[in-house]
A protein has these predicted regions:
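A cross-kingdom feature that marks ATP-driven nucleic-acid transaction machinery
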Residues: 1-120
Length: 120
């Protein structure tokens, strides 16, 4: 279901973006793949969307446990590998099947650049 869930998230994003339901319009979006030059390991971000002022990095997790800080830390690290204009702000969104740990929820409440979406 992992790849199917990623497609569901992409479809939900596209619908909200087209309907003007997001804080800003994102004319470009797609999956990102690359190589970390330090580890020489392949890396992937499920969805990256760009607007005039923001790059939005999104991760979709279909797992039977709450998502924790480690997923955010990985997403933030991977976002540094994506070439983006310096003037753009970075925002992050995580979509999860089973919700989030209390630590990640508490952090998201303090960070306007982080959005969490749960399907439970």
């Amino acid at each position: 279901m992992g790849l199917g869930f990623e497609q569901i998230v992409a479809d939900l994003f596209d619908r909200a973006n087209t309907a003007g339901e997001l804080a800003e319009s994102y004319p470009t979006r797609g999956r990102w793949w690359g190589t970390d030059p330090d580890t020489r390991q392949a890396e992937e971000i499920d969805l990256v969307a760009g607007s005039k002022t923001t790059t939005l990095f999104m991760e979709a997790k279909w797992v039977n446990r709450p998502i924790g800080l480690d997923v955010l830390e990985t997403l933030e690290r991977r976002s540094t590998l994506v070439p983006t204009p310096r003037k753009r702000q970075k925002h992050y969104a995580i979509y999860a099947k089973q919700g989030f740990t209390s630590e990640l929820v508490a952090l998201a409440e303090k960070r306007p650049d982080l959005a969490l979406y749960s399907f439970l």
